[in-house]
Amino acid sequence: MPAWARYALVLAATAVFVVFAYHARYAKIDEFTGFRMEEMTRLIAGVLAALYALTVAVELHIGRKLNVGAQALLCVVVGLILLAKVSLFDYVSDDYDIFLSNWIYEYSQMGIKQGLGTYIGSDYTPPYLYLLLLISRVKNYPWQYLVKAVSMAFEVLLAYAVTQLAGLQVRGAGKRVVIFNLTLMLPTVVFNGAYWGQCDVIYTSLA
């Protein structure tokens, strides 16, 4: 499939996914009344659509030698994987409830410059704290969704890295996309990011 056709497929598949994401139901959404419900839903759908587009684009790049039907099927598979993970978004882990949410709230009370220079009692490395600082700029929003979305974005990088490493021994686009999808579905990956909202995948993907 030529590159322009892959891009068109990514756009078309993302448009379909946005419809599903927009009409999904999120248990925590009623707790945030700063935005109108429609605005909140659009924001959530936008975040999920960006995740979907990233994942599909990377997977179609890996499977670029597959036929059109196979690539269209990959778009469906990615959508199902992502929707399954989204179903875990409303779970609030103790770590998020006790630590992450409070750190983000503290940052939300500061400006960017002040936040960069303030120690908030965290033992996380500065780059991750900078991500939390950026998340805190989004007011009246379910921050846990963004925390989990960040981890899920790095899951794509992890899956790509694993696929590239496996590609040293495994030949064939079909096998490589299977490895990519299996990595995204590993229990440790799913629970660490979409369920617990942990950031272990970030440094793992960059290792």
Which sequence ranges carry the predicted segments?
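Start-transfer (signal-anchor) and selected internal transmembrane alpha helices
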Residues: 1-86, 164-171, 176-178
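Generic alpha-helical transmembrane segments of integral inner-membrane proteins
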Residues: 79, 83, 134, 153-157, ...
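Hydrophobic transmembrane-helix microenvironments that flank and shape a buried ionizable site
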Residues: 82, 125, 148, 152, ...
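Extracytoplasmic catalytic/substrate-binding loops of multi-pass membrane glycan-assembly enzymes
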Residues: 89-105, 112, 119-131
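Transmembrane-helix motifs of polytopic, lipid-linked glycan transferases
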Residues: 149-170
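Membrane-embedded helix bundles of polyisoprenyl
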Residues: 176-206
